Amino acid sequence: MSTVVMHAVVSVDGFIADDDDQVGPLFDWYFNGDRPLFAGSEADVHPSMSISERSYGYVKPFWDSIGCAVVGRHLFDLTNGWEAKPPACEHLVVVSHRPRPDGWHPEADVPFVDDVTEAIGIARSLAGDGVVALSAGNVAGQALSLGLVDVVAMDVVPVVFGSGKRYFGHLDGQHLLEDPDVVLQGDRVLHLRYPVRR
């Protein structure tokens, strides 16, 4: 069965973007190394992403394991759904109370569903034995509250935003995590991975 991993790059104070949806220096580490994340046709879509050797040893296997991504409508709108070619995987599920945009890549088999549990179920089916990568934010916070998240993964960048879009969204209640099973210092990024305590 697939593993659901809540993931994003995050500031030290827990934000995945500022109040205006700008990421500032959060993604700088994706471009400060010598190891390209993508090769072949993927490199044509994401040509300049090269990370440090240390980060590559963690990020590349993780990205290669992703079978399906789940995003909220806000991220979908910001990225235009990556033009139906999400980074690191073939499948995408969008959680939204609004329908698929008219004319948006009619050839793409991208489900739009308004229920988080249903979205995770569809994503698990599409991912097979692969990872379901759940983008951090409000939808992921709901999934964590519903007990649908197996792992919380953060790429922490040394910047303080002060305010913005929260990694866990508007999360209710306390959720215990296990001790991290990954703590890896990259170049201007700290990779952390916490299994969710059951």
Task: For every predicted segment, state its role.
Residues 2-146, 158-198:
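Portal/gating segments that form or line small-molecule/metal binding sites
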Residues 148-150:
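Short acidic amphipathic segments
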Residues 153:
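A mobile, often basic/glycine-rich helix-loop segment
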